[in-house]
Design a protein with these regions (language model features):
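Solvent-exposed edge beta-strands and adjacent loop segments
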Residues: 1-88, 131-151
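Protruding loop/beta-arch "assembly-hinge" segments enriched in small, turn-prone residues
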Residues: 7, 151-153, 157-173
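Broad hydrophobic/π-residue packing in well-ordered secondary structure
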Residues: 22, 26, 75, 93-98, ...
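Short C-terminal domain-edge/linker segments immediately following a structured domain
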Residues: 58-62, 109-115, 144-148, 163-169
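Glycine-rich loops and low-complexity Gly/Arg-rich segments
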Residues: 69, 104-108, 139-142, 152-162
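Residues within well-ordered beta-strands of beta-sheet-rich folds
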Residues: 79-81, 114, 155-157
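Acidic, glycine-rich loop-and-strand cores that form catalytic or ligand-binding grooves
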Residues: 88-126
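Extended serine/threonine-enriched, polar tracts that run as long, contiguous segments within proteins
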Residues: 112-123, 128-137, 142-146, 158-161
Length: 173
């Protein structure tokens, strides 16, 4: 085990503190446009980031190679989870999303949403996701599970083009 002296460790502490406070994963909300009252029921959602889709291998002389980046990945996906209510709010929400008109001619069930760092009332920033849809997993119910609310989970597919809007709060207060 390495034992470093305190002054050496203090340099790492000081450099880490200089970067500022870290974002806490739980400090988010997801608000679906047209269904703004449901934001308190979303427990988990994907946080979009722009990056390359991957690498392109470029052969070079003498059996060598190099990489260059692929196009930016704007079509993304990630896990989403909702708390169901006794009146079936999420069940009804999914039915509404399926039957509403989408962005494409004749397409159905796409929606736009905002994912906030904070809440819709007080936030550091939000990112706008467009042409989203959700593929839900089959919900498992269990007679022995008396300790957890019913979770409806699945995958949200969406497009993100880097649209980030600065917020109205510096600390959610």
């Amino acid at each position: 085990m390495t034992v470093s002296n305190a002054s050496y460790l203090k340099t790492f502490y000081d450099k880490t503190v200089a970067h500022g406070a870290k974002v806490i994963s739980s400090d988010f909300t997801l608000e679906i446009e047209g269904f703004e009252d449901y934001w308190l029921l979303c427990k988990q959602a994907p946080w979009p980031e722009l990056s390359s889709q991957g690498e392109i291998e470029i052969p070079t002389p003498l059996g060598s190679m190099m990489y260059q980046p692929q196009q930016i990945r704007t079509a993304q996906q990630g896990q989403i989870s909702f708390y169901e209510t006794v009146v079936g709010d999420i069940d009804n929400l999914m039915l509404e999303l399926i039957t509403q008109s989408g962005a494409y001619s004749g397409a159905r069930s796409t929606f736009n949403c905002k994912i906030y760092e904070g809440t819709p009332e007080k936030y550091l920033r939000y990112k706008r996701l467009i042409d989203c849809f959700v593929q839900l997993d089959t919900v498992d119910r269990d007679w022995e599970n008396r300790t957890q609310p019913l979770m409806v989970q699945g995958t949200m597919f969406f497009h993100y083009f880097g649209e980030t809007v600065e917020g109205n709060s510096s600390d959610y207060n």
